[in-house]
């Protein structure tokens, strides 16, 4: 994205770039046919279940003023509008946890003011949305999105861990409430007797932990040893919503003398009931709000605008990572302007606004990368087999595949397609008799399936159809509210805990916290797997000090959310991290260390070679290669949807650049010694499972 602070310049450039490919955004999705339903269904479940959970949370926090009907309606309406006239169609919109927190603060404030009360809460929140939209308009017009690159890893990961803590807090709070009687229920009912409250709470623990454990296990289904590839992929992609259905079914097992209200279930009015559509006419009541509160609404509006500016921009950034090789232009400024209009519309309708969400946005891009991979792969395999039947040479075969690849690319005037990767020398030697591209292909040696996997670059099917369809499906959930009310609330608390835990892998802040609690004598185990590069390049004392600073800042933000009125200010602390990172931290940490600890990309160092490689013959000749979804899962973090970058060990300016050495695997960074504490038993050769020396003499075997 080109930085520009000229008013309207960024919006104009975004519109110009996206209008050039608007037609292809629709035709590309339509040409995909029924295949587009797979990523559509995948992202629908990833969007709908959290929104339903947030609706239950809002129902409890706002005394039933806002429910799942409103959160689903907001997600559907904003998603449909954005998919049609939005700039970046890969961006997924939805009601997010920060919005729920801000609306909870505003409701508690309005409830405690006689001039507002519960009745004028939605009218006052409408004024908050009016102010929020005006601030977003100003930010978009002035090109504030040009600062998106200033949001470094420090701010992003701290914000992600804060959201994870709030998710877990809500899960724990919800489970504790399962042992208590609800505030708005008749306490004389049999299900609210002490013995039945205890039974409800214990059953809630079973359902919550059951969903949590099985959902976490299903996410790793692609690495299971059992089942076919398509079955493991199905469980990995749709296992979480499937587990929601399974544990909802388990909740209906108790019968007989068990009261009807056990376990407690999702409460929300049906969309056609009288009380469900009162908020749609809230615009009529906005003039009843006292003028002092209309002006005062600017304060929470500023916090929400800052929050949306940060969250929406980062979600769009993660959906457009350079590793996805997107060919169509970005649209940060225009999308922020559109978000202002959507926020205004939601405020006037009396529903909570939606904004770009993480990790659904990068998940959407990843699912479309899988779709594009499948479409290209099928055509290239057919082309390769046809060329081999015609006794074509390897050069002709590669040229035919390149032609088919170019034919399947969307013709863009301003950008050429990337093209297939180059053939590897080992492929040429293995598949031809003479090592010449003009030689005929040896069909017995040329593995079409595997070789094409190596040639295909990562690409994304950039289109609008999947975003539109998933938003329409979310809207269909509003009509299915009688079915949604069959879900136990305890299952939703388990899902909150799942979202909190699932967001931790890939968060380097969390990984450093775990490193601090690792015994010094066991720190070497961190090096036995792929690990972040700072583990080898930054002294442990510096890592500890940096992590303690982040933890203190995180606890300050989390503690602020507990303060009734001042809690609305927590987004300012997140934004304040930008000047803190730029001007304050360099005074306490070396710039080289900060660059590694606050890297722009998720960089990984390879595992140190503590064990001998397993000979390929021992794996068997029928070993299957990982599918494209499994490969992408290994490369992308769960917390923010980032690509992991494997890089070589870094050297300081005071050391000479190392040249290739066959014994280089035995040379470690000086910082590795600090981490070890004591040498690994496997490395020293004294442990029970330490590798035995190879019987082959390297010098003789190479001759």
UniProtKB/Swiss-Prot annotation:
**Which chain regions cross the lipid bilayer?**
36-56, 76-96, 121-141, 156-176, 196-216, 234-254, 290-310, 338-358, 481-501, 558-578
Biological-process GO terms, alphabetical: monoatomic anion transport; root development
Any one GO molecular-function label of the UniProt entry: solute:inorganic anion antiporter activity
According to its record, what are the GO cellular component terms? Answer: plasma membrane
Segments on the Cytoplasmic face: 1-35, 97-120, 177-195, 255-289, 359-480, 579-703
Outline which residue ranges sit on the Extracellular face.
57-75, 142-155, 217-233, 311-337, 502-557
Topology with regard to the membrane? Multi-pass membrane protein
The UniProt keyword set, sorted, is: Anion exchange, Ion transport, Membrane, Transmembrane, Transmembrane helix, Transport
Q: What PANTHER family does the record tag this protein with?
A: ANION EXCHANGE PROTEIN, BORON TRANSPORTER 2-RELATED
Name under which the protein is recorded = Probable boron transporter 2
Q: Which organism is it from?
A: Arabidopsis thaliana (Mouse-ear cress)
